[in-house]
Amino acid sequence: MRCGLCPHRCLIPEQERGICKVRENRGGRLFALTYGKVSAVQFDPVEKKPLYHFHPGRPILSIGSVGCNFHCGFCQNYHLVECSVPLSPMPIPDLVRAARREGAVGISYTYNEPLIGFEFVMDCAREFRRAGMANVLVTNGYVLPEPLAELLPLVDAMNIDLKSMDPEFYRKICGGTLAPVLDTIRESAKSTHVEITTLLVTGENDSEESIRAVVDFVAGVDPEIPLHFSRYTPMYRFTAPSTPPARLAAAHRIAREKLPYVYVGNYPLEGAENTVCPSCGAVVVRRHGYRTDRFGLAGNRCVSCSAVLRFVV
């Protein structure tokens, strides 16, 4: 039985599972083993996804399960990838009620790779759309065009990991390929709000050349896509030291040459969390950790100069 969800296109023998560990061949049919089962449910600031230009300051219901179709040696959630945490059943109506009760903007499919649980995400997304709430994907983007096209009409925002522009990085470190991720970014940016995150791993993808390659790609898709550089810390199989602050500052400086919305996460780099109006230079959103003050925004316009900014509010 061949799976048609992600570019691995796993050929799965009877009673066995694909690379993601959550899709099993039973009698010539694929079963989604984690359907309706979650490893974590909590409310987060939407900035934690990270999404800085999508309903800033609002809470969002965040859910995750287990498994992944990548196996990155530096994974920050490796316990979920290895399916080593307990799962609890979670009916979709309960999620809708919880989000509504807490005044959440919607739901975020996050923590592990959500697209390997495609069927549950689809069903959940339909119910949240009917309830008038948003659907957010935090994803590695490793999905085939057909399922992506089916899901995108239900998606209101995405944060997509772009780990590197080096195909060898994806092959050796992640166990995947780069091209499908780039295709996902290009296609998603046509129809929904997209932000990009690059984890800068010391000695692997933090050179100036690597950073410029990421920036050039994002600028080529749409220069107004917000780009987040995140600080790596030693985790799982990687023991290299944490990303030096100087590299984070350099990445921010390099990216700002071509992109107006560039941020640094997991490290308090002065000014690198705030949003500045590209037209007049005024600070429109000030952030400290996950605390957000959108004092300079009126809707999606700059209060100082009335320029329309790339925000969904």
PLM regions with names:
Residues 52-53, 149, 294:
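Short secondary-structure boundary/capping segments
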Residues 4, 66, 70-73, 126, ...:
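Core alpha-helical elements of the protein kinase catalytic domain
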Residues 1-65, 77-82, 273, 283-285, ...:
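N-terminal [4Fe-4S]-dependent radical SAM core
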Residues 19-29, 34-41, 85-95, 291-303:
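Short cysteine/histidine-rich metal-coordination sites, predominantly Zn2+-binding motifs
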Residues 60-66, 70-103, 108:
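Glycine-rich active-site/cofactor-binding loop and its immediate structural neighborhood
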Residues 92-243:
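Conserved AdoMet/S-adenosylmethionine-binding subsite of the radical SAM
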